[in-house]
């Protein structure tokens, strides 16, 4: 859809996921340059960043964590009137807050886990939830601060560790089943990807340490179960008001019932990350995935222009 463009790729940033973001950014920059675009790297580690003149589109794909995923940078770019890839500021804000995401899922009838919110290390083990539990910061990504509570005596340590990363933590029942994730691209669910850690859960270590986790895409589910998983993922994506692309984490119970865990509006973009794996299973190379993210932003810009022109034409006819 696009010719050669001047693209600013934001990467790094001030969050706890800075190193992951830099790794994602290196891949995106390389891919876009290989496609002939002029690419400028911008690290918004301080709030006084300035966009280069003549920037045509800002690619936010690699900017993970607080500031990148919580709607802050999207809000700044919206105020500047600058075109950028991915979800808008409101959808980003909702998705980054795991509690808001669950509330939106519940309102939309999307299956999700039973949960409580805790803000103190002194909080006793919730009586309305059954062990094992998952404890995680309300506003973090990349499994930062994620803890598993298998026994009651693990509770206080898990809570204290998760509270290091946010003032509130989400406590939810650990779903027994198969762990999957579903990429969403231009309103279409990509092939389901199954995540199989060799030991423990899909925490920060297993996510970013080579050889700790196996991935299967497309996952081996029957057609009906696959459709249910993809439908739940799309439901969550629409519930938060998503656009362009995202990745939705879904647990699958033994009976095939999907349970949405969270929505990632800026998922990992290293060449071995999960969204690129799912795109590859759908026949898209890493470079094609990066290009489609740019094209989706340009498509939105063109649609907005056409709506504006149509509105002017309608007004002209009305006053003729």
Where do the language-model regions lie?
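Active-site nucleotide/adenylate-binding loops and adjacent lid/helix of ATP-dependent enzymes
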Residues: 1-11, 39, 51-54, 94-178
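ATP-binding N-terminal substructure of ATP-dependent carboxylate-amine bond-forming enzymes
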Residues: 1-96, 100, 107, 119-126, ...
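A short small-residue
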Residues: 3-10, 209-219, 274
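Short, flexible, mixed-charge acidic loops at enzyme active sites
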Residues: 72-78, 201-209, 265
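Phosphate-binding site of ATP-dependent enzymes
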Residues: 150-231, 252-259
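ATP-dependent carboxylate activation and anion-phosphoryl transfer catalytic cores
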Residues: 5, 109, 222-320
């Amino acid at each position: 859809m696009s010719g050669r463009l001047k693209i600013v790729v934001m990467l790094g940033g001030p969050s706890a996921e800075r190193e992951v973001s830099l790794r994602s950014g290196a891949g995106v920059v390389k891919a876009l340059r290989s496609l002939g675009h002029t690419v400028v790297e911008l690290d918004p580690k301080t709030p006084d960043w300035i966009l280069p003149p003549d920037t045509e589109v800002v690619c936010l794909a690699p900017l993970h964590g607080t500031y990148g995923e919580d709607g802050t940078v999207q809000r700044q770019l919206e105020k500047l009137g600058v075109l950028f890839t991915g979800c808008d500021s409101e959808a980003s804000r909702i998705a980054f807050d795991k509690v808001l995401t669950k509330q939106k899922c519940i309102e939309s009838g999307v299956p999700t886990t039973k949960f409580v919110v805790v803000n103190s290390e002194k909080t006793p083990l919730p009586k309305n939830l059954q062990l094992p539990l998952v404890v995680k910061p309300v506003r973090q990504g990349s499994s930062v601060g994620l803890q598993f509570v298998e026994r009651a005596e693990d509770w206080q340590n898990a809570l204290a560790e998760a509270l290091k990363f946010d003032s509130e933590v989400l406590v939810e029942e650990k779903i027994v089943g198969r762990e999957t994730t579903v990429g969403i691209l231009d309103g279409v669910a990509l092939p389901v990807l199954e995540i199989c850690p060799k030991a423990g859960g899909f925490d920060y270590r297993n996510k970013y340490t080579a050889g700790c986790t196996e991935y299967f895409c497309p996952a081996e589910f029957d057609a009906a179960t696959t459709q249910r998983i993809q439908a739940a993922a799309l439901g969550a994506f629409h519930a938060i008001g998503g656009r362009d692309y995202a990745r939705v984490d879904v647990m699958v119970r033994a009976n095939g019932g999907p349970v949405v865990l969270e929505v990632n509006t800026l998922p990992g973009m290293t060449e071995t990350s999960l969204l690129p794996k799912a795109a590859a299973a759908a026949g898209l190379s890493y470079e094609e995935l990066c290009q489609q993210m740019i094209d989706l932003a340009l498509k939105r810009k063109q649609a907005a222009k056409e709506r504006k022109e149509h509105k002017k034409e309608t007004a002209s006819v009305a006053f003729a």
